[in-house]
Amino acid sequence: MPEKPLRIVLVGAGALLGKALNEELSVSAFAAADLHLVDDEAALGKLTAAGDEATFIQQIEPDSFDGCDFTFFAGSRELTRTHWHQAFRAGSRIVDLSGELEGEPGVPLRAPWVQDNPAAAPDLQTRAVVSAHPVALLLALLVTHGGQTAMMKALWATLLQPASEYGHEALEELHRQTANLLSFQPLPTDVFRGQSAFTLAVSFGGESPVQPAGSAGVISGQYAEVAPAGSPSLALQVIQAPVFHGYALSVAVELSRPLAANALGRALAGPHVHIVADADAFPGNVRAVEEEDMQVLVRPVFEDAGSAASRETRRFWLWIVADNLKLAAQNAIACAAELDRLRPRGGVQ
């Protein structure tokens, strides 16, 4: 008798991250699942797609999680806080993309592409996991690929963070600010609490929900947790950029021994990482949106005439762009696949 399809509930289906996750699920190993899209009242009734079928986003009801195998929380932290116990009590396995469950007892932080320590892996008792921040995953993935060839000693990174990290409202406000500045109109500041268009900012003040320094703390902490043992230290600053989508990172790398740029590129290349050899062909963050892999440009920093002559150096600049929403969705699906391998199958004989 064929196994019945998995039942999946996507909470926060109307959010930007929820939409990206819905799209990625439709082309993943979970494509045949019975997918239910739910959200709070603000997103009710919106027409969207679940796989190849049109559907409406439904309201979260007391029985929304009954018989559910997996629940993805892709909306706000508040939405997760309100409903995750309901999903847990219903017996669903949970993947949290909002970060609300980080630190909860028995809820590990996961980045399956880079975490290979069996002691840290989910077990049969694991019912919920937090999907790691995409930038923590991205940096840990580069370190993992580099391995013994690159032997990285330290990373210094600057992240240019897009408005889409903060949802529809932030995108709309950035758009309106851009238009209003060009027409000399007052700026809406409900989300950012200050000007975000045509400027780079490290802070919008304590009243703003947009806190680049807070993002830096989350990413640094999660990188330390998911990166392999012995990984290089990370110094990170986050700058809010006047862009809609896509991460861009400038990363300075120091190695333990000199390498040529092409040798480092070969070491870093691998699953989910595409090395772009020519700067003229390197995509910006706009073109990186919808790319399956992060795009990486490797540039040597020659310390002296000797290293320039040998074309080998211990210091490099990496310029990296990636689709922030797609990367987050892909990691969440990898988390679910990890939990699915532990799911009991069949009946008692």
Predicted regions and their residues:
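Charged docking surfaces used in two-component/phosphorelay signaling
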Residues: 71, 163-349
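N-terminal Rossmann-like NAD(P) cofactor-binding subdomain of oxidoreductases
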Residues: 1-194, 231-233, 284-290, 296-297, ...
